[in-house]
């Protein structure tokens, strides 16, 4: 994989160089010391992946991510030394299309390979994600029965560009929204709690991490909060599981959507938002085949038109809508 480093700190650059050296297939093609330089270098030589710092002179990592994704899009991972202090910037960058975030590898420790492992694992996942194919497996659903009570659920999946998209969508919903909402966003568990807090503050809706064994409740937004997959169980509660191990992104949108297909007996809507790759497309297809309404974000409003495009390609979406139109549609569906 051809990789670029954007960072103004020599020690951080050296730490990234040493980490990448453990995988000979990775080639560093250029290094930029600020965002403006990175934007220009991408025009001249677009890498497969950029390891992007956040705080830099001239142009910071958030604006550089926005410019690069608009002009010469490629995979971007945010690398930061202080995730707590930079949490808001992390989500802003992800809103512009950054795929993930990882701590800067430690340098000079007793086990440098172990220190490099989280970064190398992220890169491996992204390499796989870029090259994956849409499966055609059919999900066998339990027969849909008339529910004893009108349970309502909105299942939402998002990846690159997701935080900003989720903020816009949730802002469009009233506090009295009558359906439960479960979000599956591709984000590392160390950032999940911060993301829930940020979304809650930005949207005005109660957003918190989903807990093992709890039941989705109307008007409450639950965010998958670990690096395991989240599933709906037969009794209507939520559970985290390491299986299936072959799903690279954790939590997997497909896994959750398919569990909704199997076990949700009330009304449901599946929504697939911006993101790179194809996670969620097959799960959305399963929800449609079950008879649920399915919505995919359109190309014009997507920061990264990967997952919604994959869904459209296999006819998984009943409706394809611009992001600002999705919340009003959900209100319409559940207030008829």
From Swiss-Prot:
One of its GO terms (molecular function) is phosphorelay response regulator activity. Phosphorylated by CheA. Phosphorylation of the N-terminal regulatory domain activates the methylesterase activity. Involved in chemotaxis. Part of a chemotaxis signal transduction system that modulates chemotaxis in response to various stimuli. Catalyzes the demethylation of specific methylglutamate residues introduced into the chemoreceptors (methyl-accepting chemotaxis proteins or MCP) by CheR. Also mediates the irreversible deamidation of specific glutamine residues to glutamic acid. Its main location: cytoplasm. This is Protein-glutamate methylesterase/protein-glutamine glutaminase 3. Contains a C-terminal catalytic domain, and an N-terminal region which modulates catalytic activity. Its EC number is 3.1.1.61, 3.5.1.44. Belongs to the CheB family. It comes from Pseudomonas savastanoi pv. phaseolicola (strain 1448A / Race 6). Residues 2-119 form the Response regulatory domain. The active site is at residues 159, 186, 279. GO terms for cellular component: cytoplasm. It is an enzyme of class 3 (hydrolase). It comes from the Bacteria. Keywords: Chemotaxis, Cytoplasm, Hydrolase, Phosphoprotein. GO terms for biological process: chemotaxis. It catalyses: [protein]-L-glutamate 5-O-methyl ester + H2O = L-glutamyl-[protein] + methanol + H(+); L-glutaminyl-[protein] + H2O = L-glutamyl-[protein] + NH4(+). The modification 4-aspartylphosphate is found at residue 53. It is found in: Cytoplasm.
């Amino acid at each position: 994989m051809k990789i670029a480093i954007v960072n103004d700190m020599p020690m951080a650059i050296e730490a990234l160089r040493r980490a990448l050296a453990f995988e000979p297939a990775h080639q560093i093609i250029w290094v930029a010391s600020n965002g403006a330089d990175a934007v220009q270098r991408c025009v001249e030589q677009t890498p497969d992946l950029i390891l992007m710092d956040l705080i830099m002179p001239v142009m910071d990592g958030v604006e550089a991510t926005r410019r690069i994704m608009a002009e010469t899009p490629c995979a971007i991972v945010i690398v930061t030394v202080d995730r707590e202090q930079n949490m808001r910037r992390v989500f802003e960058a992800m809103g512009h299309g950054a795929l993930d975030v990882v701590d800067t590898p430690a340098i000079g420790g007793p086990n440098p390979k172990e220190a490099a492992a989280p970064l190398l694992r992220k890169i491996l996942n992204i390499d796989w994600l870029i090259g994956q194919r849409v499966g055609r497996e059919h999900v066998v659903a339990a027969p849909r029965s008339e529910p004893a009570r009108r349970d309502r659920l909105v299942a939402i999946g998002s990846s690159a560009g997701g935080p900003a998209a989720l903020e816009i969508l949730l802002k469009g919903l009233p506090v009295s929204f009558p359906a439960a909402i479960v979000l599956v966003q591709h984000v590392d568990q160390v950032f999940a709690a911060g993301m829930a807090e940020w979304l809650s503050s930005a949207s005005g809706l109660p957003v918190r991490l989903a807990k093992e064994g709890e039941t989705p409740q109307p008007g409450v937004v639950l965010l998958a909060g670990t690096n395991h997959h989240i599933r709906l169980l037969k009794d209507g509660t939520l559970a985290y599981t390491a299986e299936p191990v072959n799903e690279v992104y954790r939590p997997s949108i497909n896994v959750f959507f398919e569990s909704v297909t199997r076990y949700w007996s009330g009304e449901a809507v599946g929504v697939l938002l911006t993101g790179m790759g194809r996670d969620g497309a097959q799960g959305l297809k399963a929800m449609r085949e079950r008879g649920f309404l399915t919505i995919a974000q359109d190309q014009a409003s997507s920061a990264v038109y990967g997952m919604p495009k994959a869904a459209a390609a296999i006819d998984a979406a009943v409706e394809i809508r611009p992001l600002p139109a999705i919340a009003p549609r959900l209100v319409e569906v559940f207030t008829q």
